[in-house]
Amino acid sequence: MEIDGFQQLDLEKSVPSKKTTPKRIIHFVDGDIMEEYSTEEEEEEEKEEQSTNSTLDPSKLSWGPYLRFWAGRIASTSFSTCEFLGGRFAVFFGLTQPKYQYVLNEFYRIQNKKSDNKSERRGSKAQAAEVPNEKCHLEAGVQEYGTIQQDVTEAIPQ
């Protein structure tokens, strides 16, 4: 019997293992070929998707789960339909702004108006403080530029 077991192991080793087929084969213009293989993570994700996509067969459920199944399906379908149609009706009737957006717009408009009035008042004060005789500019080399006029004899100590 050990010989049979030994022969079975040899047969298992001699049988070619599962050959991996490429997920995609990409042919480039210059003639190169690239084979893309799926990873273990991708294979696990595909298996999970298949298990979640397999829906329950309502005919095999008892009455309680059967009613819950259909109630859930009707509720989710109704909600999705109302959500879709609500968005379409809102666009059709022009209800695309938030409910109280007009109040916010008015508030910001009034704030901007007040700040403009304040800046105008400040600007008018600054204009009044300017030199009344702007046409008479002093040259940079003049001794009196930027100083208080004093008698030259008083400024020089003896």
Curated annotation (Swiss-Prot):
Residues 36-48 have a biased composition (Acidic residues). Pfam families: FAM177. Residues 36-59 are annotated as: Disordered. It comes from the Eukaryota. Belongs to the FAM177 family. PANTHER family: LP10445P (PTHR31206), PROTEIN FAM177B (PTHR31206:SF9). This is Protein FAM177B. The gene is FAM177B.
